[in-house]
């Protein structure tokens, strides 16, 4: 709205902005979630950041609650035999047991446990290209206080948004691992990235699920 020409067109409904969200392009959603910090560097004030975090959490919960309906539509409208719910990593942060009851009743929950090498690669990728992330409220409060103290920053507006993501991601990543495992232990099954790399077709995948199930009940 800083450009008068575009502002006039938007306010008169002469043009509109539409997010092009697809299965392979979730950047509009990530852009809305945003990063915390200096507005001049693209960051958000703490109050607005927390507001968007809360919206993201509720949206993710609602999406998981819709999974049974999505399965029904996939089968009856599109004729798909199988349904894969490729959930985001923040699923373990939602603290909403109801969604795991629904997911376990309608899908097979698989936790893909990363090797040490894969963990290093994921962290390096996040540091190289820091992206917006969802944080549990208590985790954010604790880590933000540590960051502000460590770098002696009196105001959130002084935070470099990308630097904060680079700093917090490894801590977030390792805090999530026991949460993933707890979900798998109670509601699902665990496979490893090494096992998954060997999957080449549907039969391999189904065989791997059988192995995971047998491993848990043995």
Over which residues does each language-model region extend?
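ATP-dependent small-molecule kinase phosphotransfer cores
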Residues: 1-98
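Short loop/turn segments at strand-loop or loop-helix junctions that form parts
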Residues: 46, 112-116, 197
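Long, charge-rich C-terminal accessory regions
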Residues: 76-77, 130, 157
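Hydrophobic beta-strand segments of well-ordered beta-sheets in folded domains
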Residues: 81-83, 106-111, 188-191
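Conserved phosphate-donor/acceptor-positioning beta-strand/loop module used by diverse small-molecule
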Residues: 86-87, 102-149
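A short acidic (Asp/Glu
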Residues: 94-98, 121-124, 204-205
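Short, surface-exposed basic-aromatic patches at helix termini and helix-loop junctions that form
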Residues: 96-106, 212
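NTP-dependent small-molecule kinase module
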Residues: 153-218
């Amino acid at each position: 709205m800083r450009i008068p020409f575009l502002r006039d067109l938007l306010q008169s409904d002469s043009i509109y902005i539409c997010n092009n969200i697809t299965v392979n392009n979730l950047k509009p959603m990530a852009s809305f979630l945003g990063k915390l910090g200096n507005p001049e560097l693209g960051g958000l004030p703490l109050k607005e950041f927390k507001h968007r975090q809360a919206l993201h959490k509720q949206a993710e919960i609602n999406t998981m609650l819709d999974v049974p309906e999505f399965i029904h539509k996939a089968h009856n409208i599109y004729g798909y035999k199988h349904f894969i719910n490729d959930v985001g990593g923040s699923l373990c942060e939602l603290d909403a047991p109801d969604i795991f009851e629904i997911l376990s009743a309608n899908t097979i929950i698989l936790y893909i446990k990363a090797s040490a090498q894969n963990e290093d690669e994921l962290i390096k990728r996040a540091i190289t290209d820091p992206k917006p992330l969802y944080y549990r409220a208590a985790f954010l409060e604790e880590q933000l206080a540590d960051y502000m103290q460590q770098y002696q920053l009196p105001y959130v507006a002084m935070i470099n948004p990308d630097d904060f993501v680079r700093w917090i991601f490894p801590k977030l990543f390792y805090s999530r691992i026991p949460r993933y495992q707890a979900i798998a232990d109670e509601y699902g099954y665990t496979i490893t990235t090494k096992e998954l790399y060997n999957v080449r077709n549907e039969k391999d995948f189904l065989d791997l699920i059988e192995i995971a199930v047998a491993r848990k009940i043995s």
